[in-house]
Structure formats: structure tokens, C-alpha cells
Amino acid sequence: MSQKKKASLSKIHTGMNSSSKQVLSSTSSANEKTEDDVGDEMDFSLQCDACKKLIIGLNNLDRFDCGHFYCLVCSPLQPKENHSSCATSTSPSNAFTREVSPQQIAEHTGELSNNGAERGKIRGSTRATRKGSVNKSKSGRTRRHKKVPDQRLWYFLYLSKPVVVSLPTDATYHDLMARLYTLLGVSGKTHMITLRTQKSSSEEGEGEFSGRGDPAPLEVGDSKTRLSDLKITRHKMLLLDVDDQKKDGSGEEKKEKKSAEKEKKISHENVQSLSPSSRAEDPRSS
């Protein structure tokens, strides 16, 4: 092959390579699109908060900081000063959060779910500890943290509202009452807390013929009894009542009570002395 033919072939190859590069660059530039272009092509349709029309494409919508969306026609008519007091004006992440007032909380029925989600144990021993939280002594040895005991949740119904107490699995009845007094903010000297059990729906169905009856007080033999040993149903909340303790009378009332008892004793002795049997026994009567 002559040198002229080789030169012509090399020119053809270089021309083909340049044309292919141009085609590839044009296709890549066509594929490179911005987020706005993608949003328009995906046909996002949102409703304008003013005219309530469905607007297709994000470029045709104006989003305020409070989370409202307006079309390009209604957006200039909305003064942004009026949107500073919106409920969602704090941040876009809090746009769907609302505070719940106590009036909106419905009264709890006291029935717990059977899936075990509300009755599950808190496994304190299986919690993973971070490496940064492990303290080191002066010698460089790591200190081992004490094993956290397993916790158990106990549910109560107080004034138609649920009360939840977390205690160790080996907690006693005394521990439970101490926690309830602290939680309710009452003192054992002035108030008395009583617990009553109520039957679950399955137990009520089984005892239809024997009668349901009112909730019975919780039977506790000793304050040191473990809660796990008590007969507490896990499907119904325990009813929690707080009553004022009956105070004893004052010192004067106690004195009056003692004097009344003495007078009763004396009168009873006088009646016995005047009876015929006592006269017969008395030698002076003969």
C-alpha cells in the first residue's frame, strides 16, 4: 500500500472519531437535566392553596417558608407577612406536627392490645454501649458498666386516664406504691392508694353465668411480695384510686370519748348491783 493511500485512510478514521465524539457529547448534554426539568417531566401536580386548582410541574408553583404552595398567578397576591404566624411557619420539617390539647385526649377504655406491643419488656441488658461512653481509669483499663436490670411496664387507669410505671422485674409491692405516691404527688400520711383488678374481655365471657361483679381489690399478703407473684391480669389495666385518710379526732374529742366509756361502765355496774340475782348473792340483803 502506497503512502498516499495510508494518509487518506488515517484522515477518514480521524474524521469518523471526531463525528462520533460530537454525537456522544450532544446526547450526554441532552441527558443532563436539572431538578426542575425532572420535576416538570414527572408531572408533579399540586393544589394551589388559594384557587384550589391542580398545577402540573414544580416550576409553576411558588412555595412559601410556611409550607403553603401557590400558583404563579396567586403567589403575587399573597403577602408573605400574613404567613409568618402560620401553624407550620417554624420549619418545613415541622409542617405536619401539631400540639394535642388535653381536651382532645379521649378517655382510655383500659383494654390493652393482645399483640404484646404495649406489654413488652424493656431489655436493658441488651442495649449496645457506645465506645465513646466507656470511661477509662488512670491505668488505661476500661471500666465495666453494671448490668442494667430488665424493666417491666405496669399500666393503671386513674380518672379514666392511663398511667404507666416502669419498674425492675424483681420489684416488690412496696416499690410500686412508693413510685405511685411519687408520681401522683401525694403523701402516704394524708392519702391512701388502693388498687383494684378488673376482668379481661375473655374472662368476662367465661364468667357470664356466674356474674361479672365489680372490680375487686388487689390481694396483697405482704408489702415485700414481688409483683410477679401477684395475680394481676396483663390484658386489663389496674384501677387506681386515691382517697383521703380518715384523721383521728382532736385531744378533746378523745377525752370526751374516754369519759363516755367510763360513764357507760359505771352505769352498767350499777344496773348489775340492782338486779335480783346480785341481791340474792349479797349477804346484807338477808
From Swiss-Prot:
Residues 243-268 have a biased composition (Basic and acidic residues). Transmembrane segments: none annotated. Residues 1-38, 108-146, 196-227, 241-286 are annotated as: Disordered. Coiled coil: none annotated. Residues 18-29 have a biased composition (Low complexity). It comes from the Eukaryota. Residues 269-278 have a biased composition (Polar residues). This is Uncharacterized protein F10E9.2. It comes from Caenorhabditis elegans.
